[in-house]
Amino acid sequence: MNGSFFTMDDFDLDGKRIYLRIDINSPVNPETGEILDDSRFRAYSKTINELKSSKVVIVSHQSRPGKNDFTSLMGHARYMSNIIKKEIKFIDSLFSHDAINAISNMSAGDIIMLENSRFYSEETLNADFETIKNTHIVRRLSPLFDYYVIDAFPAIHRAQTTLIGFKGSGPNIAGRLMEREITMLDKFKFFRGSPKIAILAGSKIEDSIKVSRAFLKDNIVDYILTGGVVANAFLYAGGFNIGRKNMEFIIKNNDNYESLINSATQLLQTFRGRILMPDDFLLSPSGRHVTISESINDDEIIADIGFNTVDKYSKIISRASAIFMNGPMGIYEIPEYSIGTREIFNIVAETPALKIAGGGHTLNALNSMHLTKKLDYTSTGGGALINYLSGDSIPVIDALIENKRLFGGKYNGR
């Protein structure tokens, strides 16, 4: 897909005025402002360092209105400065006179970070492009830049003003993170070799069902291995008794749980034998080990997959040619219920297959086990990752493609 849009290799960006849209939306301590996970900051250092001879203006967002971590980006600018070892000037507005004056007076090598784009209602209009391009954000900022580098992969599924609003203003260029994400995800989707597997676990049932449908319908994978709450939903859909507390958790956290269970049932019927579920579990708080044929008490929750399931999954993983992994097998944060996740993740890490992982809990677990570097790629995306792998229309990528059609004949690149 990379040839469909501009990349940073297509232009000489030295000395140019660059609008750089990234996504450093990160876990933040709402009381102290401390950045609790800097993985996205580090992921963007390559793009920023490559633009060291340009005049770079960084735009990003943090959380959303109403959340306790909906904060200014002042601390983010300071944190990024420490990572790239270069001063980033913070401007506490997005398009004020002060912001425009600061941008207009930049020298090559300067970096500015503007205020949280979601402080402005125009960012989340959910409107058509004609409306978006006439916002104050676009009208006031667009004349200030030569190029627009769009590198916010984790937000590609959102048609927000600072992401797609400049597609008619000049060349919109995929940044290095965007380019790498798409390259690696496409590599998995179109990888030749069998068997290909997806490990879908954790608690996000709707996302996993969505990906499962796309992966199986388009024969992107041969098998799906389930764990966590995702497995519980498929087990219930398959007619198994998962216990009262486990079903209550599904109902409480999914308003559309009936629709999700129906979808899971249809997938099991349509793709028989290709969605694999646990055969045994560890239960909390009792610590009991039970097989799927045994009863689960009303006060017990499924906290981990059991040893039989680990053995069954391991045999499939060891033969895989390519693996996509999203979600832990159980409550991995509690040591006694982390065994399934640890065993499966370690087996994945040691296989020679193409290995790609995504999702916040997955990456946290991999980091805690010091396994991240053993994988071929770990994605920064959450909802964006799911939407991309599911084959959905992606507003930001669509905008990049349309922009190249608009400006491809006007710019001959380097």
Swiss-Prot record:
Keywords: ATP-binding, Cytoplasm, Glycolysis, Kinase, Nucleotide-binding, Transferase. Pathway: Carbohydrate degradation; glycolysis; pyruvate from D-glyceraldehyde 3-phosphate: step 2/5. GO terms for molecular function: ADP binding; ATP binding; phosphoglycerate kinase activity. The keyword Cell inner membrane does not apply. GO terms for cellular component: cytosol. It is an enzyme of class 2 (transferase). SUPFAM superfamilies: Phosphoglycerate kinase. Coiled coil: none annotated. ATP binds at residues 333, 359-362. GO terms for biological process: gluconeogenesis; glycolytic process. InterPro entries: Phosphoglycerate_kinase, Phosphoglycerate_kinase_N, Phosphoglycerate_kinase_sf. It is found in: Cytoplasm. It comes from the Archaea. HAMAP family: Phosphoglyc_kinase (MF_00145). Belongs to the phosphoglycerate kinase family. Monomer. This is Phosphoglycerate kinase. The lineage of its organism: Archaea, Methanobacteriati, Thermoplasmatota, Thermoplasmata, Thermoplasmatales. The gene is pgk.
